[in-house]
Amino acid sequence: MSYLNADHPNGMSYGDGYLQGAGSLGQVVKIVGDDLFAVNIDSAAKSFGLLIKDYASGDMPGIYCGGGIYTTDVFTGSIAAGDALMAGVDGKLTKQTGTNPQIATAISVSGGTLKFKLLI
């Protein structure tokens, strides 16, 4: 089972909108309309935060945002400490490529666990 621990969170949003389409714990979301969020599968799009659990389409999601330190096993690709992270094509954290917006910085990766600083 996947996890996302808020080790030192700065903010959480709940009750600020609804989810368009389903989303899973740890996926990156973006704003797609008034009070409407969706999983961000476009690496170039501006991200808003991370889902705190699994949600169905139409649910009012909890979203970690506003920075903080987190640990998770929800990420893709090879990441090293110090890497800039972005939203990947699957909506998960991945190593930043090109000029895509950075949303987090990797602090450590060990045993399938990523510790990172959220910048959004």
Feature roles, as predicted:
Residues M1-I120:
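Surface-exposed, low-hydrophobicity beta-strand/loop segments enriched in small/polar/acidic residues
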